Amino acid sequence: MLRAALSTARRGPRLSRLLSAAATSAVPAPNQQPEVFCNQIFINNEWHDAVSKKTFPTVNPSTGEVICQVAEGNKEDVDKAVKAAQAAFQLGSPWRRMDASDRGRLLYRLADLIERDRTYLAALETLDNGKPYVISYLVDLDMVLKCLRYYAGWADKYHGKTIPIDGDFFSYTRHEPVGVCGQIIPWNFPLLMQAWKLGPALATGNVVVMKVAEQTPLTALYVANLIKEAGFPPGVVNIVPGFGPTAGAAIASHEDVDKVAFTGSTEVGHLIQVAAGSSNLKRVTLELGGKSPNIIMSDADMDWAVEQAHFALFFNQGQCCCAGSRTFVQEDVYDEFVERSVARAKSRVVGNPFDSRTEQGPQVDETQFKKILGYIKSGQQEGAKLLCGGGAAADRGYFIQPTVFGDVKDGMTIAKEEIFGPVMQILKFKTIEEVVGRANNSKYGLAAAVFTKDLDKANYLSQALQAGTVWINCYDVFGAQSPFGGYKMSGSGRELGEYGLQAYTEVKTVTVKVPQKNS
């Protein structure tokens, strides 16, 4: 994702230096203790306590200390939000009667307000999530703005067609909004995933009930305030903080929710699809887990491949669904690649995410912290070679040392399961045919990458790999214009681009009898 925000020369100083230079020249100094303004439930453009009056703590992962209490929504709160959304979607409502171009203007206005408050939002994201502030400001917020503005431009351009059917008839299609859209967003990119969900839904005229992740609710709730300020009618966007088994399950199984979009684990994706099918057969789009292969051919530019493979795995503390978490290296360059990758990992700066020199902050919470350490222990027990890292990186907070394993075999747990942390696994291969089979031998199929100077190899691998996105000589290059989604158990449907609009519309055919048809 960083490549979308920081276009740099193909050769040049490594990522940390680029970020430091960008930080000193472009990024305002953060307030390391931003005030929390929004910690309730947002329904009908108003703030509410939970029906149960329950709250839960959101925690600063750098320290383990509580930031504040947040209203804990559950089924009753979801019911209230759905009713508000239904009212906003009624025929003749201000939202339904609004011109498509005006919907676009509201999205542009929302983007402008987010840009106005960019420094505050970046600091709040870092406080609640733990990602480096420079990344929050330069990458996440930049992509949020681009996504919302991209979909604002689509609002009056995604439409139906006239169809020349036989006989004295006039036939045309309409692209109509689906209705009440449940959206459940993850904790690894809270603001960005909110934009990915809201952009296409609002551009096409839907109404939204969104559940934010309990680990990172604060920035998405602040954006709710900006949604009201932008002028969206009451009930168009409703945001419920809460937990998956309660608030999330209520959305997935609700009889009056017409569609659910979820980004998160494959395990939870299963539950959502079952709940959707056993309720009202609501539409489902799922962006789930991954174990993405990153293939380094022997003819690759070694400097570039090492740095990009490091970035592919360690970016965002390794908390990326599309992380290059199986690094396949051709045998004649394996030793050199491993040596250089270990050196790069050892030089990675882990620390205070508000320090502009920091490359890696803490994991999002204690649960993830312990889970990752458990995977590291599993790798050692199953015979992988621990080359660096392997433990906690600080006395407090949820920091983990950048970790690299060599001599990893396909059957090992760390080579099969999504770790979602700063743990690199390097595997050796001989031939291109071999690596295709091994790369595809996974239940996941979200992304893949190939590093080679041979265009024929690149083209062959891009066609052979079972993944929704394949990067050639790059990694994590995203644009609002390009669709993203997975094969197999990495999900269904696509987000971003024109393809991302399809899941939020129903295509209606209208056929009219006419006295006489003329060409």
From Swiss-Prot:
Organism: Rattus norvegicus (Rat)
Any GO MF annotation of the entry: NADH binding
Assembly with partners or alone: Homotetramer.
Transit peptide: 1-19
Active site: residue positions: 287 (proton acceptor), 321 (nucleophile)
Protein name per the record: Aldehyde dehydrogenase, mitochondrial
PROSITE patterns with a match to the protein in the record: ALDEHYDE_DEHYDR_CYS, ALDEHYDE_DEHYDR_GLU
EC numbers for this chain: 1.2.1.3
Pathway info: Alcohol metabolism; ethanol degradation; acetate from ethanol: step 2/2
Binding site for NAD(+): 264-269
Location of N6-acetyllysine modifications: 54, 75, 80, 161, 370, 377, 385, 409, 428, 430, 443, 453
